[in-house]
């Protein structure tokens, strides 16, 4: 059935809420590139040089990991091959896996994301694709599918290469996708991991490299839920992180963070600055609730008792809003030719809310059954019978005339 655009009513609600509006200038962010996004909608809340080409270092590992999670089996055991270890330059982080060591996919993911063990990514790549090069092709294909515009990877782990680059915006896009996977979320939120004894090594214990989730760190945020650190001398300090507070989940990416003169870590200071800004200026607001009455109609051909019909929301509608200035509009699309009979919960249209540059739509449902008007139905039958009678008489007259 075609839909007819019907603007029933537009409501504009402007609420000015008391409270401080925390803001900052680009120079308050020490990192060369940064971005803050809402994880639910992907909306950008702050950015600084977010589309500039940057070296990602170990933040690369989130893409490697999500592909391994999606294509592998966490309980599978795989064997560490010599090539996976040999290509890791000295000085890069490692779990010192041994050639011939048998280890599960889940254990590899944990030591890869939590301890940043570079060889683990190569082991995962060979497990999934048979070779590191083939797996890297998958990485670039996945990045393209996710909408990344300026990303090109040449390895699984972020070991420096001039042709291995991305942007803060692309990493935020990848991180947002990764955080939709429950296994990924669980691993990156772990404060530590333990690799059980294997055929080549005793039990090993590793702490998460992300100080935002370390309770003993001066940068600890109780509402931080991951994700991944990174560092090379060329990339400088990097961090992708995620926080969830009061139902609002934000993702921050900072790249090229310098070492500050006071020995404080710019990647954590910048990330905390971004989260303070985000949670002081934005919130997730319930615009409307499932079952709310938003419109009322008289149904054509409905009987007197049921023809007056409320249209109710089919789902809750939540939106990211600026807490200091909420501007909400809505419009309604109703189906053509709404008439009885109608069953309760039938879909009769759509309501679309607009908040800033974001839109949210949900169905409009019938609140109750609407029955057809019996009198109208009877009249219709009588008229049909009369028409049939008239046609019969005409046919008889024509037939007699021919005789």
Features from the language model and the residues they span:
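Short, Lys/Arg-rich N-terminal segment immediately upstream of the first membrane anchor
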Residues: 1-3, 47, 372, 402-403
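Short alpha-helical segments used as structural interaction elements across diverse proteins
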Residues: 1-2, 58, 278, 396
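Sec-dependent N-terminal signal peptides of Gram-positive bacterial secreted proteins and lipoproteins
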Residues: 2-26, 380-399
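Hydrophobic/aromatic ligand-binding patch that stacks against planar heteroaromatic rings
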Residues: 15, 67-68, 242
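Hydrophobic alpha-helical membrane context
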Residues: 16-17, 73, 274, 282
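Active-site-adjacent loops and short helices of periplasmic peptidoglycan-processing enzymes
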Residues: 23-182, 186-187
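Domain-terminus/edge residues, biased toward the C-terminal soluble/receptor-binding domains
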Residues: 148-149, 163-165, 170, 175-402
């Amino acid at each position: 059935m075609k839909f007819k655009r019907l603007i029933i009513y537009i409501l504009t609600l402007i609420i000015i809420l008391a409270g401080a509006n925390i803001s900052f200038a680009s120079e308050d962010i020490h990192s060369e590139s940064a971005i803050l996004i809402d994880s639910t909608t992907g909306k950008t809340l702050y950015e600084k040089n977010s589309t500039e080409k940057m070296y990602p270092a170990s933040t690369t590992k989130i893409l490697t990991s999500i592909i391994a999670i999606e294509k592998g089996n966490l309980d599978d055991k795989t064997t560490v091959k010599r090539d996976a270890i040999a290509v890791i330059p000295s000085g890069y982080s490692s779990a010192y896996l041994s050639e011939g060591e048998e280890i599960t996919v889940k254990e590899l993911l944990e030591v890869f994301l939590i301890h940043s063990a570079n060889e683990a990514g190569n082991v995962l790549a060979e497990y999934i694709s048979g070779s590191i090069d083939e797996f890297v092709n998958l990485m670039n294909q996945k990045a393209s599918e996710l909408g990344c515009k300026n990303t090109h990877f040449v390895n699984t782990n972020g070991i420096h290469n001039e042709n291995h680059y991305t942007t803060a915006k692309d990493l935020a896009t990848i991180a947002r996708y990764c955080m939709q996977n429950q296994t990924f979320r669980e691993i990156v939120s772990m404060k530590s991991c333990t690799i059980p004894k294997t055929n080549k090594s005793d039990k090993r214990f590793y702490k998460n490299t992300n100080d935002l989730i370390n309770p003993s760190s001066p940068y600890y945020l109780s509402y931080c839920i991951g994700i991944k650190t990174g560092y090379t001398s060329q990339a400088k300090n990097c961090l992708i992180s995620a926080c969830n507070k009061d139902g609002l989940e934000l993702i921050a990416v900072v790249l090229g963070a310098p070492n500050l003169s006071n020995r404080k870590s710019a990647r954590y200071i910048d990330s905390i600055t971004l989260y303070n800004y985000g949670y002081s200026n934005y919130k997730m607001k319930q615009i409307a609730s499932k079952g709310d009455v938003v419109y009322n109609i008289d149904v054509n051909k409905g009987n007197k008792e049921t023809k007056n019909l409320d249209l109710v929301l089919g789902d809750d509608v939540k939106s990211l809003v600026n807490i200091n200035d909420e501007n909400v509009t809505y419009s309604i699309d109703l189906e053509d030719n709404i008439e009885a009979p109608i069953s309760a919960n039938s879909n009769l249209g759509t309501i679309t809310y607009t908040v800033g540059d974001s839109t949210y739509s949900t169905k409009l449902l019938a609140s109750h059954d609407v029955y057809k008007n019996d009198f109208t139905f009877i009249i219709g039958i009588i008229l049909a019978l009369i028409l049939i009678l008239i046609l019969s008489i005409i046919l008889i007259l024509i037939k007699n005339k021919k005789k």
